[in-house]
Amino acid sequence: MVEEETITVEGDYETLIPIDEYLAAGVHIGTQQKTSDMMKYIYRVRTDGLYVLDVQATDKRIRLAGKFLANYEPSKILVVSARQYGQRPATMFAKAVGARANVGRFIPNTLTNPHFAGYIEPDVLLVTDPAGDGQAVKEAVDIGIPVVALCDTNNMTSNVDLVIPTNNKGRKALTLIYWLLARQVLRERGEEDRFKYTVSDFEMEF
């Protein structure tokens, strides 16, 4: 039997989308492991041992990340996703905001070796998972650019400058988070009228 989830929102805080939409996409569903780094974003632990993320914290962090990323030249934002379910959402995020996407295997030296054929010089890195995208994160740290990361309950965040707490493994969760973040970046730039995409446009196809 699946445990039904109810999450309350403090006071009159208004989320970017209804809480039910976050829950339907499974954004709140964490793992059965937690790190001390992610404790502050955990809402509760279910009877089956699964940690549940606080979607209000997720919502606030999407707002913060949108404001942060909107300060950068679009072409200087690099979004990376080794994880399959994050590849289409990451690519669509890049298309929507004018960023650059690097999906699939991240080739070492992409950010650190000017003599490498695929060398690029971003000013900020956005990753689907700081563990799965660890090579990109390491190189970002080496060259001194900030890292924004979608982080699940089991992630370490020591090399992450801005955490977005979310289920970073589920197809629907990654679709919704990248869609929301793209919309928020354009909103912060005053360009929301350019955002013509639906959530399904961001979803991985089979």
UniProtKB/Swiss-Prot annotation:
Name the residues that span the membrane: none
Q: Which GO cellular component does the record give, naming just one? A: small ribosomal subunit
For whether the record's keyword set contains Ribonucleoprotein, the answer is: yes
Pfam families xrefs: Ribosomal_S2 (PF00318)
Q: Which top-rank group of organisms is this from?
A: Archaea
The record, for CDD domains, names: RPS2
Record keywords: Ribonucleoprotein, Ribosomal protein
Q: Which GO terms describe its biological process?
A: translation
**A GO molecular function for this record?**
structural constituent of ribosome
Q: Which family does it belong to?
A: Belongs to the universal ribosomal protein uS2 family.
What HAMAP family is this protein classified in?
Answer: Ribosomal_uS2_A
Q: What is this protein called?
A: Small ribosomal subunit protein uS2
This chain's source organism reads Methanothrix thermoacetophila (strain DSM 6194 / JCM 14653 / NBRC 101360 / PT) (Methanosaeta thermophila)
The beginning of the lineage is:
Archaea, Methanobacteriati, Methanobacteriota, Stenosarchaea group, Methanomicrobia
